[in-house]
């Protein structure tokens, strides 16, 4: 349900579709969306990865290798600008909506999508999480530091996270 997604989540899904088209894949799948989250300009996920001591661009590089191995579909019978959401990604997005609801949030934000990967990741992404030592508990801890007790009640919640850090001034 697109009305329940934040602007950054919609941006990430659109970027994932563009990436799938670029890689000549017929489906938008989990690696495409995680890549979009890791490379999102001014995105929350790269910020959280940094808090965890991880480099989102290096993780994105691993995802590029995964996407390069997804079968390509070319030829005259294919509409090059049409891609479909895979069943795996559809399940992940549905899980994201459930996570948002459980957290008392009104919109599905990028952190909900990221959290849904921990329980719904395909084998390639599980391996990337293992290789980079990314786990749900440390991610939740970093998220709590940035988000605090705020709830997602608008479609632009990422703008309000860590506001003191962005605009505050140390008076000491």
Describe each PLM feature range:
Residues 1-172:
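Histone-fold recognition with a strong bias for associated Lys/Arg-rich disordered tails
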């Amino acid at each position: 349900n697109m009305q329940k997604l934040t602007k950054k989540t919609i941006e990430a899904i659109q970027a994932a579709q563009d990436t799938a088209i670029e890689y000549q894949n017929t489906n938008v799948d989990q690696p495409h969306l995680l890549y979009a989250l890791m490379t999102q300009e001014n995105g929350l996920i790269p910020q959280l990865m940094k808090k965890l001591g991880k480099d989102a661009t290096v993780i994105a590089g691993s995802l590029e290798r995964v996407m390069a191995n997804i079968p390509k579909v070319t030829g005259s019978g294919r509409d090059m600008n049409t891609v479909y959401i895979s069943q795996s990604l559809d399940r992940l997005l549905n899980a994201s909506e459930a996570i948002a609801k459980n957290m008392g949030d009104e919109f599905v934000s990028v952190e909900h999508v990221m959290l849904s990967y921990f329980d719904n990741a395909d084998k390639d992404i599980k391996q990337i999480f293992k290789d980079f030592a990314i786990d749900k508990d440390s991610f939740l801890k970093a998220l709590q530091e940035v988000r605090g007790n705020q709830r997602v009640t608008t479609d632009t919640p990422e703008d309000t996270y860590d506001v003191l850090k962005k605009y505050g001034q140390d008076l000491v």
